[in-house]
Design a protein with these regions (language model features):
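Helix-loop-strand module that forms the ligand-binding subsite of alpha/beta enzymes
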Residues: 1-75
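Glycine-rich phosphate/pyrophosphate-binding loop and the adjoining helix
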Residues: 77-130
Length: 130
């Protein structure tokens, strides 16, 4: 984890790609997010934020969408001095052969402090998925 923290500390921008499981982060992603906790106690969350992008992949069809995944990633990355600025929805756009079959939708994030539970405003995408 020391090497991962060094890479995170040196990064000007972070790009995260994660599948969505039951509306949230899979265990491997959750383990990484949990390991960002020391940044919280070090006060890093108060520093200047660096941009982060989240690419969401999966088969789709979950009626609960993936708002929980976005919230988890947004909160944890904030502790490490990143601001989730883009969320790209690839759910249902990668075929069984691993080929991309369409363009990602860019989701519109609500500003922090608003009703983030609603996920996104109507627009380019929805955290409810297709």
């Amino acid at each position: 984890m020391v090497q991962v923290r060094e890479l995170i500390d040196d990064a000007e921008e972070l790009i995260v790609v994660s599948p969505v499981y039951f509306s949230g982060a899979p265990s491997q992603m959750k383990a990484l997010l949990d390991r960002l906790q020391p940044y919280f106690w070090a006060g890093a969350r108060h520093g200047e934020k660096r941009p982060a992008t989240l690419h969401i992949v999966g088969e789709g069809g979950d009626p609960h969408g993936y708002g929980a995944l976005v919230g988890e990633v947004r909160s944890a990355l904030s502790c490490a001095c990143f601001s989730l600025t883009r969320v790209l929805d690839w759910v249902g756009r990668i075929d069984e052969a691993g080929e991309i079959s369409g363009e990602a939708d860019e989701l519109v994030l609500e500003p922090l402090g608003s009703a983030f539970d609603d996920g996104v405003r109507a627009g380019a995408g929805s955290l409810q998925g297709p």
